[in-house]
Amino acid sequence: MKISFLLLALVICSIGWSEAQFTDVKCTGSKQCWPVCKQMFGKPNGKCMNGKCRCYS
């Protein structure tokens, strides 16, 4: 039972990972990524990861 729950959680998390779009825009904070993501993908869903913006759909 625990294994099936873990597999289900892994599948759900991997779906979210596949929807993320990396950009080459440098950033120091997530707030800087919101207008970039809005312009590139139509939604202001994004955050700064490792110095670059990552947008979510």
Swiss-Prot record:
One of its GO terms (molecular function) is potassium channel regulator activity. It comes from Olivierus martensii (Manchurian scorpion). It is found in: Secreted. Disulfide bonds join 27-48, 33-53, 37-55. Belongs to the short scorpion toxin superfamily. Potassium channel inhibitor family. Alpha-KTx 01 subfamily. InterPro entries: Scorpion_toxin-like_sf (IPR036574), Scorpion_toxinS_K_inh (IPR001947). Has the structural arrangement of an alpha-helix connected to a beta-sheet by disulfide bonds (CSalpha/beta). The keyword Cell membrane does not apply. One of its GO terms (cellular component) is extracellular region. The record marks 47 as: Basic residue of the functional dyad. The record marks 56 as: Aromatic residue of the functional dyad. Its main location: secreted. Keywords: Calcium-activated potassium channel impairing toxin, Disulfide bond, Ion channel impairing toxin, Neurotoxin, Potassium channel impairing toxin, Pyrrolidone carboxylic acid, Secreted, Signal, Toxin, Voltage-gated potassium channel impairing toxin. Expressed by the venom gland. This is Potassium channel toxin alpha-KTx 1.5. The modification Pyrrolidone carboxylic acid is found at residue 21. It comes from the Eukaryota. Transmembrane segments: none annotated. The keyword Secreted applies. Potent blocker of both large-conductance calcium-activated potassium channels (KCa1.1/KCNMA1) and voltage-gated potassium channels (Kv1.3/KCNA3). Has also been shown to moderately inhibit Kv1.2/KCNA2 and weakly inhibit Kv1.1/KCNA1 channels, as well as 5-hydroxytryptamine 3 receptors (HTR3A). Residues 1-20 form the signal peptide.
